[in-house]
Design a protein with these regions (language model features):
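Sec-dependent N-terminal signal peptides of Gram-positive bacterial secreted proteins and lipoproteins
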Residues: 4-25
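Contiguous, well-ordered beta-strand patches that form the walls/edges
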Residues: 38-45, 52, 56-214
């Protein structure tokens, strides 16, 4: 299985967006907020076999829905921490992995049928040859990568140390260690909905346009 490196790239930016209002005395985000990040494209691209030179003809384009809810907790000074809803995400992630196994197995069945073997014949042949069922063998072979991907995602999303950054007007500025501005994000705030509308460099050129808008919704007390 291809390692899903692209997933963490999508999730990295959400650990910063919640800090937009820190240091702004006119606005308080105290409480809990949630943002749902869609990982479908990244997860599916990582496991897609349709472009494989040898086996691609036996696979359709992969599309497995997957998302993660990220919960931000703001203090009265707008410093924040963020964590994924790990119980929900673990269940959703495990379900997505099972669907990916189904996808991989179905392609192998198509290959076997092209070679003149039925599914049952291929299952029996595979188990006799490898000492395990096709599904169990694939799960065993991919377990280390899958566990690593899951841990990487959780680590990228989690910010356990309180974070605090600043704001100017409707812009959140990224800075280096010396306080030099590197780029900024724009936002709107309407009631309990915070929308990050875009990200730009200091020449006002859009960055990662496909990742926006990102929406945070305030959770009930």
């Amino acid at each position: 299985m291809k390692k899903l490196k692209a997933i963490s790239a999508v999730v990295v930016c959400i650990c910063l967006i919640a800090s937009i209002f820190a240091g702004c005395s006119k606005i308080s985000l105290e409480g809990k907020w949630v943002s749902t990040i869609d990982l479908t494209e990244e997860f599916s691209e990582g496991g897609d076999m349709s472009g494989d030179a040898e086996m691609g003809q036996y696979y359709d384009k992969l599309n497995i829905p997957l998302s993660v809810d990220v919960i931000y907790t703001f203090d009265s000074d707008n410093s924040y921490t963020c964590v994924p809803d790990e119980e929900k995400f673990k269940a959703d992630f495990d379900e997505a992995v099972e669907k990916m196994l189904d996808y991989m197995i179905e392609g192998m069945y198509k290959y076997a049928e092209a070679e003149g073997m039925s599914k049952n014949e291929f299952d029996a042949f595979y188990k006799e040859t490898n000492g395990a069922s096709l599904r169990d063998d694939i799960r065993s072979e991919t377990k280390a990568d899958i566990d690593s991907i899951y841990k990487e995602l959780i680590d990228e999303i989690t910010e356990s140390e309180p974070q605090k950054l600043g704001i100017e007007d409707d812009r959140f500025y990224h800075t280096d260690d010396n306080g030099n501005k590197l780029g900024y994000q724009t936002f709107t705030l309407e009631g309990d909905t915070l929308t990050i509308t875009g990200e730009y460099d200091m020449q006002d050129k859009p960055v990662d346009e496909d990742e926006y808008p990102i929406v945070l919704t305030k959770m009930a007390e």
